[in-house]
Amino acid sequence: VNPIPILRRALSGISRLAVIALVLTGCTDHPGNTGPTASSTTQLPIPFTGLTRDMRIRWSAEPGIDLLTVPAVTIRAYRESYVLGGLMASPEFYYPGFEQAVRPNGHSGRNLNIRPYIKGDAHLEDSGFQTTTPIVGTWREHILSLTGDPTSGYTAKVCSWNYATAVELPNGQYHYPHRLPPEPLDTADQLTGIGMFRISLKAPSPPKSDPAAPQRGSAPDPTADVFGGWKVLNAESLSTEAWLGEPNDWPLKEFGADQKACMTKAPDPFEKRKFYVTGEHSRSDYPTLPADPGWPAAGT
């Protein structure tokens, strides 16, 4: 039995209460989705084509964190690969170098889903976020903190804001699909559409030259391997307090504070987020902004 769905629901409830207390004191379609389905034969294994053609990912970071150099470049490539591979439930949409940089999903709490669930995984339905209909809009990621050094490794905390994305319905309208964790449609609380990840990285040894700088451009995805020998060791989306017998690297109190930070730093106020995640909308309500900082186009 995969504990992720149970713990996600339990810890989400606990952390939401913790966030409320902190405030007072201081991105899967549901199983059985009936939207229009694209044939797998019509989707080429190319990022940001087909079902993801009208979605883009935009990044921001706290002051002092350079999104254009490692290790932030590695974090960007990892998270974007995770999002695309998870939405399409296929490893064919990972960026070049992902397979070598990211270990397979394991059996420990810290690595149960270091990779997204894909077709063939037993828990794709209850823990994945595959879309079978076009997804549109702007998915935002934000590096909240980045600590460490090349010798001991780095730890990043990343906010994921997917509330401004939506999937197409049979009637041509769009709605937010309430993924991660699965929620009843039209759920709208302060954390709906907001995720949090704690990612551990290891630099290559011996050090390799960084990818050609700067890692910015007009392309939504890289055409070459930008992982540069870096390894993604762990990627947690829940407090580690639940994993008995494993290091408690992300205690519940710290996890709740980080969730509050991701909530308060979201680009849109709660009322705007509530608008995005409830009801049916026209396509224009979910604008597709250009990728930022993007990646160098092929041949540049």
Region annotations inferred by a language model:
Residues 2-17:
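Bacterial N-terminal signal peptides that target proteins for export
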Residues 28-31:
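Bacterial signal peptide processing site
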